[in-house]
From Swiss-Prot:
InterPro entries in alphabetical order: Hydrophobin (IPR001338)
Disrupted-gene phenotype: Leads to the loss of hydrophobicity and significantly reduces dispersion in both air and water. Disruption of all 7 hydrophobins leads to altered germination kinetics, decreased survival under exposure to extreme cold stress and increased mycotoxins patulin and citrinin production.
Protein's recorded name: Class I hydrophobin A
Glycan attachment residues as annotated in the record: 50
Domain of life: Eukaryota
Gene: HfbA
Induction details: Expressed in spores.
Alphabetical UniProt keywords: Cell wall, Disulfide bond, Glycoprotein, Secreted, Signal
Biological function: Aerial growth, conidiation, and dispersal of filamentous fungi in the environment rely upon a capability of their secreting small amphipathic proteins called hydrophobins (HPBs) with low sequence identity. Class I can self-assemble into an outermost layer of rodlet bundles on aerial cell surfaces, conferring cellular hydrophobicity that supports fungal growth, development and dispersal; whereas Class II form highly ordered films at water-air interfaces through intermolecular interactions but contribute nothing to the rodlet structure.
SMART domains, per database record: HYDRO
């Protein structure tokens, strides 16, 4: 799953809202992400300490991915951002005004997958705040960044299915064998010779017939004249 810059926070619970920023604690940001936003001033959405990854994913639903995000831009009463890479993004995405309070844009997110604990006696491994020390959100893919993978086609199976059994065709007694090149050459020579000889024979036959006719006529005329 790929996460775009404009991943929408859908909320982990029905009562989730954006908390007001608290004062920085001594020593900088901490590592907590529990009730009351303990120890980390960069986290706006608080989650219960005993919330598991499975429960959090169930709150996200089937259309969103439970994620841990490093950067967050929150929307309050004013949602217009007119400069920088996020110019106008909040206003166009979730609308301007106080109705957008509690929502935000998240960046640098990685998904939180449900994993089977190594030891059944240590369910703490499945707690959300043990897997993510930053902002926990439900992120939805951008349609422009969705990736689809075509099904893998077994080309070997296709070639095997469409391959012609040439050995069976050549061994079949019904189908005649293809003529060799020598036979074709001999047949071509015979046909050429026949085309040359046939007109000559026809001319010879015609000339001999005419000669016999003239001989018969001459003999008859001579016989009549003689009589």
């Amino acid at each position: 799953m790929q996460f775009s810059l404009s991943a929408i926070v859908l909320g982990l619970a029905a009562t989730v809202y954006a908390l007001p920023p608290s004062a920085p604690v001594a020593g900088g940001a901490g590592a907590g992400n529990g009730v009351g936003n303990k120890g980390n001033t960069d986290v706006r959405f608080s989650v219960p300490d005993n919330l598991t990854v499975k429960q959090a994913q169930a709150k996200c639903g089937d259309q969103a991915q439970l994620s841990c995000c490093n950067k967050a831009v929150y929307a309050g009463d004013t949602t217009d951002i007119n400069s920088g890479i996020l110019g106008g993004t909040l206003s166009n995405l979730i609308g301007s005004g106080s109705g957008a309070s509690g929502l935000g844009l998240f960046d640098q997110c990685s998904k939180l997958d449900l994993q089977v604990p190594i030891l059944a006696l240590l369910p703490i491994q499945d707690l959300v705040n043990q897997k993510c020390k930053q902002n926990i959100a439900c992120c939805q893919n951008s349609p422009s960044s969705a990736v689809s993978t075509p099904p893998i086609i077994d080309q070997k199976a296709q070639l095997t299915h469409h391959r012609t059994p040439t050995s069976l065709v050549l061994a079949s007694p019904v189908l005649p064998l293809a003529p060799s090149s020598k036979r074709l050459a001999m047949f071509s020579r015979i046909m050429q010779a026949a085309l040359v000889i046939t007109p000559a024979l026809w001319t010879l036959v015609q000339s001999s017939t005419y000669a016999e006719m003239w001989i018969v006529i001459d003999s008859e005329d001579g016989k009549q004249a003689f009589d």
